[in-house]
């Protein structure tokens, strides 16, 4: 996962005009990277995070369709907040990515150092996809990620 992130960081020249092909390319690269990171963290630390425990509790309290809409909404709102509003408040790329990924991680209530590292990593990749494509790219990645986690763990 570190190699994947470093490669993405090396590719950090921002695209000015983003087409659907580029968006899908970066969404795919980001998704595979997130999958590798999550699998590695799962092998190291099998216990779920506080965020996962909260989501499991919520999932059992509401109909599945409502929970699915919640995940979709969370993906869109989080990306708009972190990688549009906050993103545009800061000019320097390194600070943009660091600020948004740290705040993203904090919002997901990491209860352990490993959970913290996982959410920071997720935030880093969402930030790099945002930079290499656009807000729709990071929203798409976040949405695909949340839906994949839902299908794999909650159904």
Which role does the model predict for each range below?
Residues 1-11:
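Alpha-helical transmembrane segments in multi-pass membrane proteins
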Residues 12-74:
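Juxtamembrane helix-loop-helix connectors linking adjacent transmembrane helices
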Residues 64-155:
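Transmembrane helix-loop-helix hairpins at the membrane interface
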């Amino acid at each position: 996962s570190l190699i994947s992130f470093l490669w993405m960081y090396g590719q950090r020249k921002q695209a000015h005009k983003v087409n659907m092909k580029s968006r899908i390319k970066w969404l795919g690269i980001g998704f595979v990277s997130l999958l590798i990171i999550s699998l590695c963290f799962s092998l190291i630390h099998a216990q779920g995070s506080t965020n996962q425990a909260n989501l499991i509790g919520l999932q059992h309290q509401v109909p599945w369709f409502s929970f699915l809409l919640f995940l979709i909404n969370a993906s869109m709102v989080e990306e708009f907040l972190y990688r549009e509003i906050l993103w545009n408040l800061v000019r320097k790329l390194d600070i943009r990515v660091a600020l948004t990924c740290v705040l993203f991680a904090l919002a997901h209530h990491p209860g352990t150092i490993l959970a913290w590292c996982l959410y920071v990593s997720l935030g880093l990749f969402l930030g790099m996809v945002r930079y290499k494509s656009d807000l729709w790219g990071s929203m798409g990645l976040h949405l695909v990620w949340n839906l994949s986690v839902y299908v794999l763990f909650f159904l």
